[in-house]
Amino acid sequence: MKSLLPIIALVLFVFGPARAQNPEGVWEGEIQDPKRPTVINVDFKTRRVSFSGTAPTTITQPALPSNDNRVRFQVANGAQTLKFAARQDGTRLTGEMDTGSRTIPFYLELLPSLPKPVGRAEAWQQDIDVVISRFLRYDRSYTAARREATRARLQALRAKVDRMSDQAITVELARAVALSGNAHTRLYLMRNRTEVRRVPIRVWWFGRELRIVSAATEYANLIGCRVTGIGRWNLPSAFSMVRNIKAGNASWQRYMSAYFLTSPDLLFGAGVLPNPERLPLTVSCGGRTRRVTVNPLPLRRSSTPVEAWWDLAPAYPHVDGLKPALAVEKAPPYLRHPDRNYWVEYLDAPAIVYLQYNRAQEMSSEPMADFIRRVTRTLDEHSIKGLIVDVRFNTGGDAGVGTPLVEALAARSKGLPVVVLTGRATFSAGITHAAQWKQFANASIIGEPAGDGLDLWSEGGNLLLPNSGLTVHYANGFHAYSVKDYPAFKPYFSDLNVATLVPDRVVEVSWSNYAAGRDPVLEAALARIRKSS
């Protein structure tokens, strides 16, 4: 949701009087802030340091040796200097970091140097060992029982990698990580990053129907078709076989399945397909059922996030030139601006302000402070009967960006009905803002259930696996948004007091709604405000 340590600008290492040897090799540990630890990785030989898996910074100053096992180094971060002081005891450094206003304990341990793997099996085993020895140490979302179950499953996987395909190993590794039950704890495969192949079609759940909402030119005749089977499996069976490749509730599983069900690599790894080089589908189009085969695109590994909901928006510029099911001119308001993190519109007839917040991230074209001024000006210029806040597609980012918006508008909307629209892609900071509106503006909730619960582990960082190049994300900051108390998880990273985010009225867009350019969720919100005013 938000990184605690900003970008590092300069690191200075200072050691005491010259006699003893400097620490050598790569060291890793935690700055032990009780709200959210920060993993620090230091290579004393190459003089590089990184925090929470972010890009390393080059240390430009040479280290000086010490004769009393003390190690001191400084991190210049803008106007702030983080001062580290530690004592070395063999392969462990223990000390404190001084921020200028507080001191926080930290430790570093020497990481073992991995030999070059002999063969594919050993390469995977080294990656699994990193997950066991380092990832499980840093992720705080596991209960003791779940941590041991994950460790056991990883050990079992380690013992049989020589008999498994790369795709099957990847899926099993993801499932082991997902035993945490926490949706932020995951192996990156799709969405945040792209590590597997996809076919040039995109799908979306409309109720129980999985429809093809966009496709490449050669598969354009499949647009609008309903998928009823994958490989030899009916759709419910195929869906069940890709569930829990990532942890998460039923809504989040539906959202993530829009990715997984279009990846022959993951479908093969999960046992849905016998061959990852083609995706056989059973589709129903215009009352006629037929079998088709879709071929995967070449793998393009990327660390750029890709949101499945973009496939619903005809104006979104698809990289692969996919043709949308919906014409641009038919798109309802919630699908008109997929390129904007936030935007607002005054709906004149019902005198309602509709605000869509798609991404918890500042826009350079309109900083949040400017946006808040524009929205409050709209509220001041009109006799408003209600406010609708749409976070159906807000999968997160930095909750600190949108919090001032909630605070400003909640104060301005006192006495007005406020309705928040949620959906399967309301996640992470999106849930934070839905909960804030519920608590501070007594908002009603309409739409689909959100993609996670009120209480969750987030924050954290990334660990790169040395051979596969895959990345695991650990979570270590607890967000307590419900009325339930968690003494063992205090101090909370973030705290609210909300009874529930279950929608007051569950409304979902059907395929016929979508094809007609209708938004029944917004319609239900407008009706609720009209009834209240």
Question: How would you describe each model-predicted region?
Answer:
Residues 49-50, 67-71, 91-95, 113-118, ...:
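Short, surface-exposed linear segments at secondary-structure transitions and domain or protein termini
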Residues 381-388, 392-530:
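Conserved acidic, small-residue-rich alpha-beta core segments centered on
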